[in-house]
A protein has these predicted regions:
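A short, charge-rich alpha-helical start-of-domain segment used by transcription regulators
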Residues: 1-21, 34, 45, 111
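Short amphipathic alpha-helical boundary/capping segments
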Residues: 7-10, 98-106
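C-terminal flanking helix
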Residues: 16, 20, 41, 107, ...
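Σ70-family region 2.3-2.4 aromatic/basic alpha-helix that recognizes the −10 promoter
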Residues: 16, 34, 38-45, 55-75, ...
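Residues within helix-turn-helix
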Residues: 31, 125, 136
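DNA-recognition helix of helix-turn-helix
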Residues: 66, 70, 131-158
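Short, basic/polar amphipathic helix motif occurring as a linker/hinge flanking DNA-binding modules
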Residues: 71-94
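A short pre-motif secondary-structure segment
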Residues: 113-117
Length: 158
């Protein structure tokens, strides 16, 4: 097995749950999410020679898996991108449903960047590279998402 395939396998094994969680949030269905992650990794293996090395391999893989999930979501009339994970800590503190609703109401780009930042634990540069946007766009988009969520949470408390 080539060194590149070993690296891809290591990313798959170590980050599968993160990929699945983000894909599930994008497509709104666990089965479609598994298919998206699987097919995304198939694309990664088939097109591994296209990785130029200007970003970490995992970041390149994130871009492919996110694009596959978005493609599947469009094809299968998805629910809006949302936090569909039932094992989230927010469920335990009673905030899960209201927060899920608020996150689901955000524009798609804000939700996607929010999930890549907090579910996948990617830094701004990695998110920017994975989505093909600037670091400034990532920061501004996260700031807008935080601001909107903060405003809606404050309104809900009054």
């Amino acid at each position: 097995m080539s060194a590149r395939l070993v690296e891809i396998e290591n990313v798959y094994r170590s980050r599968y749950r993160s990929f699945l969680r983000v894909a599930s949030a994008i497509v709104g269905d666990d089965d479609l999410a598994r298919d998206a992650v699987h097919d995304g990794f198939v694309r990664v293996v088939v097109h591994r020679q296209r990785w130029r090395g200007d970003a970490p391999l995992e970041v390149w893989i994130w871009g492919i898996v996110v694009n596959e999930a978005r493609r599947r979501g469009r094809r299968h009339d998805p629910r809006p991108i949302s936090d569909t994970s039932s094992d989230d800590a927010s469920s335990e503190n009673g905030l899960g449903d209201p927060i899920r609703s608020l996150v689901a109401a955000l524009p798609e780009r804000q939700r996607l960047i929010l999930f890549l930042r907090y579910y996948a634990d990617l830094d701004y540069r990695s998110i920017a590279d994975a989505l093909g946007v600037s670091v400034g766009t990532v920061g501004a988009t996260l700031n807008a998402a935080h601001s909107t969520l903060r405003t809606h949470l404050q309104e809900a408390q009054t």
